[in-house]
């Protein structure tokens, strides 16, 4: 039995499939655990030794639907609803 390149050609079973949380092909089928995000754990997998990877997923890398409007709203006193005040000349 050889142990080098030739034995790699015999591999045809999938160990990982797509993770439903992070979308990467890192979900281990037998372990039922994602090696990328740690699913089904409640907290997302992240370590300090991979600071670059943390930055790729951190706040500010996505759409920021709520946060990108918050600063403008805060400057105006977090007003909501109501009609605009009429200007009197």
Curated annotation (Swiss-Prot):
Biological processes, Gene Ontology terms: cytoplasmic translation; translation
Molecular function in Gene Ontology: RNA binding; rRNA binding; structural constituent of ribosome; zinc ion binding
Cofactor(s) annotated in UniProt: Zn(2+)
Zinc finger feature spans (C4-type): 19-37
Domain of life of the native organism: Eukaryota
InterPro entries, A to Z: Ribosomal_eL37 (IPR001569), Ribosomal_eL37/eL43 (IPR011331), Ribosomal_eL37_CS (IPR018267), Ribosomal_zn-bd (IPR011332)
Co-factor: note: Binds 1 zinc ion per subunit.
Residues annotated to bind Zn(2+): 19, 22, 34, 37
UniProt family annotation: Belongs to the eukaryotic ribosomal protein eL37 family.
Function summary: Binds to the 23S rRNA.
Stated name of the protein: Large ribosomal subunit protein L37-2
Taxonomic source organism: Drosophila melanogaster (Fruit fly)
Taxonomy of the source species: Eukaryota, Metazoa, Ecdysozoa, Arthropoda, Hexapoda
């Amino acid at each position: 039995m050889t142990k080098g390149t030739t034995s790699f050609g015999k591999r045809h079973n999938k160990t990982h499939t797509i993770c439903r949380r992070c979308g990467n092909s890192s979900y281990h089928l037998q372990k039922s655990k994602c090696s990328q995000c740690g699913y089904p754990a409640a907290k997302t997998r992240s370590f300090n030794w991979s600071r670059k990877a943390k930055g790729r997923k951190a706040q500010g890398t996505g759409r920021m639907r709520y946060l990108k409007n918050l600063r403008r709203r805060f400057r105006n006193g977090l007003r909501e609803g109501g009609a605009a005040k009429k200007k009197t000349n």
